[in-house]
Amino acid sequence: MKRSFLFWRWPLVASGVALIAATYGLVRLAFGLHLPDMSDDLGIDTGAAGLISAAGSISYAVAAVIGFLAAERHPRLLVIAATLTAGGGAVGIAVATDAATCAPAAAIASAGAGLASPALVRLVARTFAEHESSTPQAIVNAGTGPGLVAAGAIPLILTADWRMCWMIAAVATAVAGIAVLITDRARESAPVDTRANRPAILPPREWWAAHRSAVAASVLLGVGASAIWNYGRTVLVEAGASEAQSVTSWILLGCGGAAVIVTSRLLRGLQPRALWLIGASLISVSTLAIGAAPAQGTLSAAACAVFGWAYVTASGALIGWTTQINAAHAAAGTALLFVTFMVGQALGAAVLGALLPLVGPVTGFAAAAALGIAGGASLIAPARREATAPRV
């Protein structure tokens, strides 16, 4: 591999990791981390928390649809929009005075992640256009892990004030977004954008058919993953865990996600379906463990670490899956599958928010785990129609 190739391409991977870390780890997925403290100050009960989380997931989905339509032609504009929405929303959460003012800010903040993913998939794909891009794509997607580690470390090391944590997240998002724009040097050598070489906005019919089972699986696993993301720390605190213990579990969750950066090279020989099944199975086992035994500190900590690795692995499998179907529409496919993944999380957050006060974490988390297993098992035997669909 040429030295010049390493010199100017990999800085984009590093800045991409930072933007995913900020928009996902520090902003989109940090709501559950800060929820116990925010609930006390803003008067957010479990039902309201579920609705706010669902609104954030819907906002993410809408943003990802925009990314679906715009990523192929305007990835840099999406990076700017992702930075503004995630950063601005984080500031809005920091200054919120009650649940009514927190909800729209949380929704705006969640949009940043939905815009960032398809944009970065496109930027990485064109930067590594003449080389295998699965590893850099997996590394960028694993930025969620370091972001979660940082989200947990900030209240332990810098400040316990949840408002200041959100302000720090806003600043980090701005820095990461600017870094991506600076390190995206592939635009300098990109071909002239003519009608002949422009990708179509909407993929062909066969492309949609090839994604049917992936869409169904991602919705189911999204529901399964929603339990830990939205209520995991709350369940740990209610079971008697101290603030330090519950935050440490969140940091371990991030460490598990960050470990994907290392394991991506070791597992790159596996097909996306296999990675998806592994991720879905471990997400479900982790969810079941935390719901059944939240007071067991060692078990809960291990479950969080496993969940973090499994979640990032599963989401990375979605990128690999759609790229395998049609690399030219990888950004659009990522947006589509991340939308359906978050639709599942929105449904799960709302339903679990209503159910947990009635049935408790054991039953609620077990139901989520069962749906997660269903999401993984649905791909063991792919539908005949998809299996025979032409690779377009």
How should each PLM-predicted stretch be described?
Residues 24, 108-120, 306-318:
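Core transmembrane helices of Major Facilitator Superfamily
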Residues 43, 95-101, 293-295:
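Helix-breaking motifs and short loop linkers at transmembrane-helix boundaries and internal kinks
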Residues 62-97:
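Conserved MFS/SLC helix-loop-helix module at the cytosolic interface between two early adjacent transmembrane helices
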Residues 63-75, 259-272, 356-357:
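Helix-to-loop junctions at the C-terminal end of transmembrane segments
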Residues 99, 130-185:
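Helix-loop-helix hairpin linking two adjacent transmembrane segments in secondary transporters
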Residues 105-142:
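Cytoplasmic helix-loop-helix junction between adjacent transmembrane helices
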Residues 273-318:
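C-terminal transmembrane helical hairpin of 12-TM major facilitator-type secondary transporters
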Residues 325-361, 365-368:
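A late C-terminal transmembrane helix in Major Facilitator Superfamily
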